[in-house]
């Protein structure tokens, strides 16, 4: 997982702006705002940003996803159920990737030029 060669995601969305970068989290693991709760249930705010894509990933135990980097694209990954082991390091380095286990109800952020991969320890 995250060895020497990385695939570049060719989906360059738009050039980054300095203003856009100021809204990014400082750390990969994102602190979520408190949910709005009433007798009907709750609404959990996740991402309050303009975006061009949203996806849902379902993966089997033991699989690897991503294992690449993006030139200008960035994304958030919210874990609905289960967990992921998220690995990341600056693109172009040989340093050992940092691993963060992200559980249900947690979210991780990936900026451009960060090698990243996810493994799934459970279905």
Predicted segments, located by residue:
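Glycine- and acidic-residue-biased ligand/ion/polar-headgroup-sensing regions
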Residues: 72-85, 89-90
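His/acidic/aromatic-lined binding-pocket segments of jelly-roll/cupin-type domains
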Residues: 67-68, 74-79, 100, 107-108, ...
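Short beta-strand His + acidic residue motifs that chelate non-heme Fe in jelly-roll/DSBH
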Residues: 43, 67, 86-87, 110, ...
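A short, acidic/glycine-rich surface segment
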Residues: 41-42, 62-66, 94-95
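Short acidic-glycine-tyrosine-enriched beta hairpin
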Residues: 91-112
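A short, N-terminal "cap"/entry segment at the start of jelly-roll beta-barrel domains
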Residues: 2-53
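Extended, hydrophobic alpha-helical segments
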Residues: 58-60, 87-88, 96
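Conserved short histidine dyad/triad with adjacent acidic residue
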Residues: 55-72
């Amino acid at each position: 997982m995250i060895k020497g060669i990385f695939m570049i995601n060719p989906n360059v969305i738009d050039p980054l702006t300095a203003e856009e970068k100021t809204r990014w989290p400082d750390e990969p693991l994102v602190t979520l705002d408190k949910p709005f709760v009433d007798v009907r249930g709750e609404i959990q705010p996740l991402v309050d940003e303009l975006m061009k894509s949203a996806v849902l990933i379902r993966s089997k135990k033991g699989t690897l996803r991503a294992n690449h980097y993006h030139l200008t694209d960035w994304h958030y990954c919210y874990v609905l159920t289960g967990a992921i082991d998220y690995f990341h390091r600056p693109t172009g380095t040989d340093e050992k990737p940092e691993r963060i286990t992200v559980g249900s109800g947690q979210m991780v952020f990936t900026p451009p030029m960060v090698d990243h991969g996810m493994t799934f320890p459970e279905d």
